[in-house]
Curated annotation (Swiss-Prot):
The keyword GTP-binding does not apply. Pfam families: Fe-S_biosyn, NifU. One of its GO terms (biological process) is protein maturation. [4Fe-4S] cluster binds at C149, C152. This is Fe/S biogenesis protein NfuA. It comes from the Bacteria. Involved in iron-sulfur cluster biogenesis. Binds a 4Fe-4S cluster, can transfer this cluster to apoproteins, and thereby intervenes in the maturation of Fe/S proteins. Could also act as a scaffold/chaperone for damaged Fe/S proteins. Its cofactor is [4Fe-4S] cluster. NCBIfam families: PRK11190.1, YhgI_GntY. One of its GO terms (molecular function) is iron ion binding. Belongs to the NfuA family. Binds 1 [4Fe-4S] cluster per subunit. The cluster is presumably bound at the interface of two monomers. Keywords: 4Fe-4S, Iron, Iron-sulfur, Metal-binding.
Length: 191
């Protein structure tokens, strides 16, 4: 479920030492399974533990996860990173916005999962996103770009060298990827 590095456990131990005895941490997702999902960590005193919580025991601490957040924290990583600029706690939860799908799920769901959990976070850095519109009978994934990708001069490169390569590698049953977005500059353009 969740992995907490030794460095992060040490960091939490220092913080927990200043709290009520028996206090541990709670890891949660607000708005799980939506584009607005946000992850967080808080203190979890003994009287805040719910019967439906899952407890994840680590070498130095325990983490409580509520029933609703649990599936969205699959493969989550919490680390405490120190470099020349200082230190920070990082929480990466690739499934927070969309629940991980099983390998036996329909192709459409598996492709959508990869787009939402791996490709869109990269495009979001430029204000963009991509949506799967359909998968044709002859194995083409039909995509539509939005946000900062709409009208971007790099969209062909992103499609062929990034998205298509990744999707074809993960899903050999796909034959290619096509873009149905109108990229000519106009009223619909993002910039």
């Amino acid at each position: 479920m969740i992995r907490i590095t030794d460095a992060a456990q040490e960091h939490f131990l220092k913080l927990l030492a200043k709290q009520e005895e028996g206090t541990q941490i709670r890891v949660f997702v607000i708005n799980p399974g939506t584009p607005n999902a946000e992850c967080g960590v808080s203190y979890c005193p003994p009287d805040a533990v719910e019967a439906s919580d899952t407890v994840v025991k680590f070498e130095k601490i325990s983490a409580y996860v509520d029933e609703l957040s649990s599936p969205y924290l699959e493969d989550a990583d919490i680390d405490f990173v120190t470099d020349q600029l200082g230190s920070q706690l990082t929480l990466k939860a690739p499934n927070a916005k969309m629940r991980k799908v099983d390998d036996s799920a329909p192709l459409m769901e598996r492709v959508e999962y990869v787009l939402q959990s791996q490709i869109n976070p990269q495009l979001a850095g430029h204000g963009g996103r991509v949506t799967l519109m359909e998968i044709t009978d002859d194995g083409l994934a039909i995509l539509q770009f939005g946000g900062g990708c709409n009208g971007c001069s790099m969209v062909d490169f992103t499609l062929k060298e990034g998205i298509e390569k990744e999707l074809l590698e993960k899903f050999p049953e796909l034959k290619g990827v096509r873009d149905l977005t109108e990229h000519q500059r106009g009223e619909h353009s993002y910039y």
